[in-house]
């Protein structure tokens, strides 16, 4: 079976290797602004993931293979926290998350190029941050790590020191809930 990861994320590549030995990487250039947030996080991340999968499918000149696409958001106080637009924006996000609980949603879409069948699911995890002081936040931002991550932190990196506890799937917070992915692939009849 030919697998295609519709992402350039190093984190997703590392996680996918845990369940799929060989795969091709074809990043999506889907414009996420095409999907308006309607207040439902699970629908939103699945719709974004579907857009990425179909975007990659439209670039391919083949009729077999499985496309795997995912999108992750942080949700806090009624707002979606995406990737920060600047260091100051990252600071504001991290300061707002300090001492609070937020939710991390990841959508997963599996698209079979031969049958045109789509399966979608999502995962939600809750994350509690410790109280962060300004120095901690500024030092973290200097590492550059928060600049390409939803919510301005990476639990698998230096940002993990901010996390007091989680409820749910750790891999979801990293960016690819491999348990959900494994069972979605099984539902599609893919043997791993």
Curated annotation (Swiss-Prot):
<dbReference type="InterPro" id="IPR003697">
    <property type="entry name" value="Maf-like"/>
</dbReference>
<dbReference type="GO" id="GO:0005737">
    <property type="term" value="C:cytoplasm"/>
</dbReference>
<feature type="active site" description="Proton acceptor">
    <location>
        <position position="71"/>
    </location>
</feature>
<comment type="similarity">
    <text>Belongs to the Maf family. YhdE subfamily.</text>
</comment>
<feature type="site" description="Important for substrate specificity">
    <location>
        <position position="156"/>
    </location>
</feature>
<dbReference type="GO" id="GO:0009117">
    <property type="term" value="P:nucleotide metabolic process"/>
</dbReference>
<keyword id="KW-0378">Hydrolase</keyword>
<dbReference type="Pfam" id="PF02545">
    <property type="entry name" value="Maf"/>
</dbReference>
<feature type="site" description="Important for substrate specificity">
    <location>
        <position position="11"/>
    </location>
</feature>
<dbReference type="InterPro" id="IPR029001">
    <property type="entry name" value="ITPase-like_fam"/>
</dbReference>
<keyword id="KW-0963">Cytoplasm</keyword>
<dbReference type="GO" id="GO:0036221">
    <property type="term" value="F:UTP diphosphatase activity"/>
</dbReference>
<protein>
    <recommendedName>
        <fullName>dTTP/UTP pyrophosphatase</fullName>
        <ecNumber>3.6.1.9</ecNumber>
    </recommendedName>
</protein>
<feature type="site" description="Important for substrate specificity">
    <location>
        <position position="72"/>
    </location>
</feature>
<comment type="function">
    <text>Nucleoside triphosphate pyrophosphatase that hydrolyzes dTTP and UTP. May have a dual role in cell division arrest and in preventing the incorporation of modified nucleotides into cellular nucleic acids.</text>
</comment>
<keyword id="KW-0546">Nucleotide metabolism</keyword>
<dbReference type="GO" id="GO:0036218">
    <property type="term" value="F:dTTP diphosphatase activity"/>
</dbReference>
């Amino acid at each position: 079976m030919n697998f295609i990861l519709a992402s350039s994320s190093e984190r997703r590549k590392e996680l996918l290797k845990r369940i799929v030995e060989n795969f091709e990487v074809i990043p999506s250039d889907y414009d996420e602004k095409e999907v308006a947030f309607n207040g439902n996080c699970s629908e939103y991340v699945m719709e974004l993931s579907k857009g990425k999968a179909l975007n990659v499918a439209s670039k391919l000149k083949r009729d077999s293979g499985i496309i795997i696409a995912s999108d992750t958001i942080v949700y806090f106080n009624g707002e979606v926290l995406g990737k920060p637009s600047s260091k100051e924006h990252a600071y504001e996000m991290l300061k707002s998350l300090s001492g609070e609980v937020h939710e991390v949603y990841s959508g997963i879409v599996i698209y079979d190029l031969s049958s045109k069948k789509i399966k979608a699911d999502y995962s939600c995890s809750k994350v509690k941050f410790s109280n962060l002081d300004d120095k901690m936040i500024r030092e973290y931002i200097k590492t550059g790590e928060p600049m390409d991550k939803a919510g301005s932190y990476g639990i698998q990196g230096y940002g993990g020191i901010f996390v007091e506890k989680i409820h749910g799937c750790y891999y979801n917070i990293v960016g690819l809930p491999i348990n959900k992915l494994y069972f979605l692939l099984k539902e599609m009849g893919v043997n791993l």
